[in-house]
């Protein structure tokens, strides 16, 4: 990963105003910080959230709280709990989408 030039920066994620993103069911709240071409996010998924799209973008995703299920278009599923992560490159595998039955808080770099 090539990180863009950036000064040392502490971030208070609770101070960033969230944007709401409805899913097919439930919703996601994104708190976003853009640093050059890198996007940092703290994302909160409501219980019952299902993404409204399939994604081919690369990510590093770390589960802070709750439980996240990632489904790949080829039928594979992976469930992550707090303290677990996954990473995938742009177009690195079949497209994926996220869901959660209980809600989840994530830290995402893409």
List the model feature ranges, each with a label:
Residues 45, 54-70:
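Short, conserved beta-strand element in jelly-roll/cupin
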Residues 86-91, 101-110:
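A short hydrophobic beta-strand segment most commonly corresponding to one strand
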Residues 1-42:
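A short, N-terminal "cap"/entry segment at the start of jelly-roll beta-barrel domains
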Residues 74-91:
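Short acidic-glycine-tyrosine-enriched beta hairpin
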Residues 50, 67-71, 85:
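Short beta-strand segments in beta-sandwich/barrel cores
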Residues 36-55, 89-92:
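Conserved short histidine dyad/triad with adjacent acidic residue
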């Amino acid at each position: 990963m090539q990180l863009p030039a950036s000064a040392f920066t502490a971030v208070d994620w609770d101070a960033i105003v969230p944007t709401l993103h409805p899913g097919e069911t439930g919703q996601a709240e994104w708190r976003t910080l853009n640093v050059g071409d890198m996007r940092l996010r703290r994302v909160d998924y409501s219980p019952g959230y299902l993404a409204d799209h399939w994604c081919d973008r690369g990510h590093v995703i770390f589960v802070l709280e709750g439980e996240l299920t990632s489904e790949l278009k080829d039928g594979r599923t992976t469930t992550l709990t707090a303290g677990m992560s996954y990473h995938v490159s742009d177009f690195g595998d079949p497209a994926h989408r996220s869901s959660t039955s209980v809600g989840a808080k994530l830290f995402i770099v893409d």
